């Protein structure tokens, strides 16, 4: 992917709400929202009609909305679908940030469109958008447990300290690129993120 048809207007960080899941691999999308708010200010506020917490991010001449669904991961579409429909957001203007077990900790990859790859949060968003798959994704590597039977407990657990540092570094680098994504400069963001070892 080198270009996006338009700048990002909504960044959705996927995860599970509640203290029980805080800091788990599955909540990598939440980690990005926390980092953006730490850097640029603002606060997430509950919007019950969208089953989500929302904030507005101001970054240079650009702004977008940040969304943290308050459904569980498997029902993320209950937040994204109604919001996108109400504001008539083209799928290409939505960036969904999620954990990716097929990438090692410390890697981030951007992608536009595609399937869900077994990720239940993406699966539900695709369903809620009327089988539309054209939204953008930021895939934050969290590593793989080695066998598919171990995936659920793995993503719902907290990473070891060295893995956590690698994931946090990747989140920080993704946060560095957000202004380019808001401007639609996907080529520049991809060049930086995809060159990470």
Swiss-Prot record:
Keywords: Cytoplasm, Hydrolase, RNA-binding, tRNA-binding. GO terms for molecular function: peptidyl-tRNA hydrolase activity; tRNA binding. It comes from the Bacteria. It is an enzyme of class 3 (hydrolase). It holds the Pfam family Pept_tRNA_hydro. HAMAP family: Pept_tRNA_hydro_bact. This is Peptidyl-tRNA hydrolase.
